[in-house]
Amino acid sequence: MAKKSMIERERKREELVSKYEKKRLELKSKLKKTAEYEEKLEVYKKIQEIPRNAFPSRLRNRCWVTGRSRGYYRDFGLSRHVLREMVHDCLLPGVTKSSW
């Protein structure tokens, strides 16, 4: 299981991303529309004033059971360890172990 502090930090990042999403998109569209160099510099400065953790690229996918960030399966929102256990316990319908 991941440290509680890491999970909490990730949750706070998600809140920041949703809080500043509208402002960030407005500034990005302004940046594309403006042609003058000075205006672009002003917009860049405003973008840089947004907190670092408010950008979606700072987010990391985490397993909702353990909080593990590596070995994450997007389809299920689970890490590989939990996915394997749930498949063996028949908790994920339609998922079968492959054999060839």
From Swiss-Prot:
GO terms for cellular component: chloroplast; small ribosomal subunit. GO terms for molecular function: rRNA binding; structural constituent of ribosome. Transmembrane segments: none annotated. Gene3D superfamilies: 1.10.287.1480. InterPro entries: Ribosomal_uS14 (IPR001209), Ribosomal_uS14_bac/plastid (IPR023036), Ribosomal_uS14_CS (IPR018271). Belongs to the universal ribosomal protein uS14 family. Part of the 30S ribosomal subunit. Keywords: Chloroplast, Plastid, Ribonucleoprotein, Ribosomal protein, RNA-binding, rRNA-binding. The keyword Ribosomal protein applies. It is found in: Plastid, Chloroplast. This is Small ribosomal subunit protein uS14c. PANTHER family: 30S RIBOSOMAL PROTEIN S14, SMALL RIBOSOMAL SUBUNIT PROTEIN US14M. GO terms for biological process: translation. It comes from Guillardia theta (Cryptophyte). It comes from the Eukaryota.
